[in-house]
Structure formats: structure tokens, C-alpha cells
Amino acid sequence: MAQLAGQPVVILPEGTQRYVGRDAQRLNILAARIIAETVRTTLGPKGMDKMLVDSLGDIVITNDGATILDEMDIQHPAAKMMVEVAKTQDKEAGDGTTTAVVIAGELLRKAEELLDQNIHPSIIIKGYALAAEKAQEILDEIAKDVDVEDREILKKAAVTSITGKAAEEEREYLAEIAVEAVKQVAEKVGETYKVDLDNIKFEKKEGGSVKDTQLIKGVVIDKEVVHPGMPKRVEGAKIALINEALEVKETETDAEIRITSPEQLQAFLEQEEKMLREMVDKIKEVGANVVFVQKGIDDLAQHYLAKYGIMAVRRVKKSDMEKLAKATGAKIVTNVRDLTPEDLGEAELVEQRKVAGENMIFVEGCKNPKAVTILIRGGTEHVVDEVERALEDAVKVVKDIVEDGKIVAAGGAPEIELAIRLDEYAKEVGGKEQLAIEAFAEALKVIPRTLAENAGLDPIETLVKVIAAHKEKGPTIGVDVFEGEPADMLERGVIAPVRVPKQAIKSASEAAIMILRIDDVIAASKLEKDKEGGKGGSEDFGSDLD
């Protein structure tokens, strides 16, 4: 409600909440910091896990920042921005989601201290933007070039990514799988490599142990052979991929045919059989002994395929058909009549196997496959899910290095280097922006401090030791949470792609700047029916944070 010449002017509908100026900033900063605080304890190899239970009683146990925030039903708009930080980090770099969110939260905490000193938000925003830009330059300077063919480097990065997750005991084994999978699907484009992660399929089955997880250089499909009379194992497979149904098509037009004699009915049935037989004969004629069909297969067609000793699988997903094409070299054919021997793919073995009591089709021994499958095993559903998340992160990290060819030391080392260098840079800039750049530098120390805290170490003492050692020995010194001492992270093999800290700082600073720009929050009241039966809503999103 506003007032004009003493008269109240109603602009917004009844029930609308409004927060202006410092109230709006305080509310948004607090909401964002609560999100950062939620995931902070999961950071690093000694981080804890979160158990999330939804309204249906489904349970997720994880320490993956992006998964935690994705599973939470977050209402506050500023808090939702922090969720976007994690999602962007996950999409662009694959790892460092918790790091990005924690840095964003700390940047806002430091900004609040400056706001309390009456520093204008515009000055803080300018200082943060300068610091973020300088941080990108510094990271490029300290990044080490590596040979993307060096499997040992790739494996160390994958191990670093997996450490601290549920699959930690088998991290060496899982890291090998991640490296091999990425190397297999990487394609050289000019002087660099490109990796399309859509070509790596993750298939999960409960049962066995994590050690039973395996990489199949080919494709695993959660389907079974359509007819009991078909072979369950085909060596030297010639594979046809068909994305039409092996059935008699119904006409587009609605037509009725009057049958006046049994002979006419018999003629119809014989013609139907002839059409199906021609389809199957064509498959046999081109030399295919395995056929994957995206749609259905008629019972009669199944019978003839079985009679000819051809293995057939129906209703295969489009994404699986594309992976089969990349793995075997086959071409997906729309019309069976157009099938030629050149359209067939090859695999040493196609076999139906029982995995955890269910039938699955394994297509293995493909020549230089550009699609692979990681079959994930584990004792419980929660273990299998967490192993999948760990492997997805590891695969993305290896992909980053293969594409960029640059790494940095992990374990808080880059953040400490940035903090030291940004402090020096702040003095060059001068003015009130200097205060914001110094605050940015101080905020980055939250990463080594949190790593130490989560490992049960004294955060202040550890940070002082690490900064002193870092200044003396160079930018690769970080926090060894296992020994509780400063250590050369590069020598210890604790490394990450440079893309991870670069994206984390970029996402965190952009989110902090966006939240600092807001000086007015207007929240409409929810509809009555939503209030009665729904979740807690946006009409009172500030109440829990006041």
C-alpha cells in the first residue's frame, strides 16, 4: 500500500507480502546461506551423507550436492537460485556442485557484512565481478597441461572425484571403468577430443557387490528374446536394426470389407502370412542373425524368425537403438524391404543372460564401439544409486580433462592460491571495490576451512598452517584431510580438471551478484484452494527465515 497526499493507494492485492531494501537483501541472503549450510557438511572426502525422505516415503541417501538440492522441495525464490548454481555446475563440469554452492553462500555472508558497513550493493557487485574475472585468469595461469593419453592422470582425477562417496572402497576399480568408458567413446576432432556422454549408458541392477560393476564394450539392453524357440546366444552376430513394426500395417482409412465365403477369409489370412513371411525372408536373405526392433513383432513373424534361428528383441528404446548403431556400426532402417547387407552391424557375441534374476541382452565384442555400457551392481538400491552418481561424476571429470587437457591440484589448493592472489589484486584496484575483492578472497577460504572441519580437524589452525605452507612451497599445497597436514596435492594425486573450479567460481559469483541486485521482493498470496490442500507455499516464504 502506498500513500499519495495522505490518501492510501492500494496497488497490490490483499495478502501480498513485500520486503524492501535491507529487509529484502537480508531475507534473500539468509535463504541462500541456509541452502549452502545444508550441503556444506557433505564437502570433501570426509563429508557426511544426507538422508532425504519424500512425501511417499521414498529414501535417497547421498552426499552429492546437486542430488540433495534436486530432491529437496525448496520454495524460497533466492534459495531456488542456489539450486540452479548446483545444476549448472553439474551440467557444465560434472563435479564441484557442493563447492559452488558453499562459495556462493560464503560470498553472500561476506557481502552482508559489507552491507552492514553501509557499502552500497553496486560497489560490492562491481568488486565481485572484478574478482571473479581475475580468478578465471589466475586459474588459467596455475593450470597444468597434461597428456590426455596419460591414463594415470585420468585415473587419479576419477579417484579424487569418487573419494568420499558411498563407492569409496572400490574407487580404484570404478575409476578404471570411468577412464576406459570415456577413452572408448572419445572422438578426435582436429587436434582435440570430443566426448558425448550420451554414448555411455548406465544400467543398474541390484544384487552382488560394487566389485561386480563392469564395463561392456557394447550395449546392454533390459529386454529379453521375444520367442522361447529363438537362440539365446549368437556368436559372430550380424545385427539388423529396424524401427518399424514387424506386423501387418493397418490402413489409414476406415474401410469395411464384406466377406461372403470361408475361401475369402482364408485368402486374407494367407495374404497376411505372406506379407509377414516376406519381411522375415528379407531379414534372413541379407544375412542377419540378430534383429532389434523398435516397435512390435507379430506372433507369426516371431515364429518364422525362430524357425530360421534368428534372435529377435522388440520394443527397444530409441536411445538404445542409437547406441546399438554406434556400437555395432549398423544403420537403423525404417522399412524392412530397404534392408541391405551393408546396413548390418557386427558383434562377436549377442547373448541373453540372467542378472539379478532378470533377463538382459548383452551385445559385446564390437569393433571399436563408439557406445559403451556400465552395468552397475550393489547390495541395495541406495548403494546402486550412489555408485551411479559417483560414476557419473567420475566420467564427467575424465571427459573434462580429455577435452581441455588441463588440471589443477584439488584439496582446497586452488582456492587458497586465489585468496592470496586476489588479496594482492585488491590493493591494485583500490577504492571501495577493494573491500569487496578482499571479501571475495576471504570467502574462498571457506573451502579449505570446511574440508578441515568435516575431517574433524581444527579449521582455524589447519587454515593458518596451509596458507603458510602454500606461500612457501607454491600453488599446489592444499589440505590433506587424511594426515591432517598441508601437502602437495599434485604429488598425492589429488587433482581435478581446471573446468571444475572455474565453473564453480563463475556460477557462485553470478548467483551472489544476482541476489545482491534484488532490493524489493513482492510475493503474491496463493490461491485459496492451494492454501487448503497443498504444500507450504510462496505466500509466506519469508516466515521461516525471519
Swiss-Prot record:
GO-annotated biological processes: protein folding
Source domain of life: Archaea
Assigned keywords, A-Z: ATP-binding, Chaperone, Nucleotide-binding
Keyword Coiled coil: no
KW Magnesium (keyword) present: no
InterPro entries: Chaperone_TCP-1, Chaperonin_TCP-1_CS, Cpn60/GroEL/TCP-1, GroEL-like_apical_dom_sf, GROEL-like_equatorial_sf, TCP-1-like_intermed_sf, TCP-1_chaperonin, thermosome_alpha
Molecular functions (GO terms): ATP binding; ATP hydrolysis activity; ATP-dependent protein folding chaperone; unfolded protein binding
Task of the protein: Molecular chaperone; binds unfolded polypeptides in vitro, and has a weak ATPase activity.
Record note on quaternary structure: Forms a Heterooligomeric complex of two stacked eight-membered rings.
Family membership noted in the UniProt record: Belongs to the TCP-1 chaperonin family.
Protein name, as recorded: Thermosome subunit beta
Name of encoding gene: thsB
